[in-house]
Regions:
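An alpha-helix initiation/capping motif
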Residues: 75, 207, 211, 234-237, ...
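Generic recognition of flexible, low-complexity loop/linker segments
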Residues: 52-54, 114-118, 236-241, 276, ...
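N-terminal export/assembly segments and adjacent metallocofactor-ligating motifs
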Residues: 1-197, 209, 232
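Flexible, glycine/charged-enriched surface loops at secondary-structure junctions
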Residues: 59-63, 198-203, 250, 281-288
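A glycine-rich, hydrophobic/aromatic-adjacent loop/helix-cap motif
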Residues: 243-291
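P-loop NTPase catalytic nucleotide-binding module
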Residues: 179, 183-249
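Short helix-capping/linker segments at secondary-structure and domain boundaries
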Residues: 92, 192-200, 262, 277-284
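Structured helix-beta-strand junction loops
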Residues: 124, 151, 220, 245-246, ...
Length: 291
């Protein structure tokens, strides 16, 4: 027996819903009027192709931008248009808008997108779930995290902007003001450096410019971060102490806190905590975003 992820558990209702669109519609009224008339697939394809050609001729082929989101995640349906896009020299983009900030921030810190195997959470003593409501959307994360709590006594920390289902299962919930996660991350690293909890051997062997990072973070203490993030300085001190005293700290970094103007920098900052603490060197430690 298994569990169906709540993200797809109701897909059958969407597929078989009586109001689901099953044929193309052409708008016959003004935008927002809700006035549409059915047309054939042949007419619809011809009209779309004609619009593409008009855009190419008037403004250049790069003004046509095939875009996908979460409606279809299958490789054939999602990426099938790439052959047309390449031949016609249409604009392209790196995956989707919703993941670009997070992916680039993670790559900036590690050089590649892959992180620690999420199954290592079962070996962790401290699990920090940051910017993702895993209890509602990621069964695998909560399975491993709760196993570590049950079998090892691991602590679970949730950092998010609201008290969601995951936060309700946390040993410590840190409620951060939206868009300010980077400041929180900087203050956590500040405390690790200040209290001699930084793993300098790891930093000097595996990271770039650790001395410059430490200098950069000196003025960014918990009081500074509290004014920006709304997280009490005392809570920042508590969390930093937990990280600094727990070698097997696993960071599960989600997409939520990266979907804002400073998203890439916020991801890079949060990811850097595991390097400052030296968590990467331990089984059950390090960071995971997506594999």
């Amino acid at each position: 027996a298994g569990v169906i992820c709540s993200k797809v558990a109701r897909y059958h209702e969407r597929i078989h819903h009586p109001d689901r669109l099953t044929q193309p519609l052409r708008r016959t009224g003004s935008k927002g009027s809700g006035q549409f008339s059915p047309i054939s697939w042949d007419d619809a394809l011809d009209e779309v192709a004609q619009r593409f050609l008009e855009a190419e001729q008037r403004h250049g082929s790069e003004t046509v931008w095939p875009y996908y989101y979460a409606g279809t995640m299958g490789l054939v349906m999602r990426d099938g248009i790439n052959r047309l896009r390449h031949v016609k020299r249409y604009s392209g983009f790196h995956s989707t808008i919703c993941v670009n900030m997070g992916w680039n921030g993670f790559i900036a810190g590690t050089g590649r997108l892959a992180g620690v195997d999420p199954r290592e959470m079962g070996c962790s003593d401290l699990i920090i779930i940051w910017g993702t409501n895993a209890a509602s959307t990621q069964i695998n994360v909560m399975t491993h995290a709760l196993k570590a709590r049950r079998e090892r006594g691991a602590k679970i920390v949730v950092i998010d902007t609201y008290n969601n289902a995951t936060a309700k299962q946390a040993d410590l919930f840190v409620c951060v003001r939206p868009g300010t996660d980077g400041a929180l991350a900087c203050a956590l690293m500040h405390v690790l450096f200040r209290d001699d909890k930084a793993d300098w051997d790891y930093l000097r062997e595996f990271t770039d410019c650790p001395d410059a990072v430490e200098t950069h973070l000196r003025p960014r203490d918990p009081a500074w971060a509290e004014a920006i993030s709304g997280v009490p300085a005392s809570q920042i001190e508590t969390l930093a102490s937990m990280i600094g005293s727990t070698p097997k700290t696993f960071f599960r970094l989600g997409y939520g806190f990266t979907r804002q103007r400073n998203g890439a920098a916020s991801m890079h900052a949060a990811l850097s905590i595991s390097a400052v603490a030296g968590s990467w060197r331990h089984e059950g430690g390090g960071a995971f975003h997506t594999n």
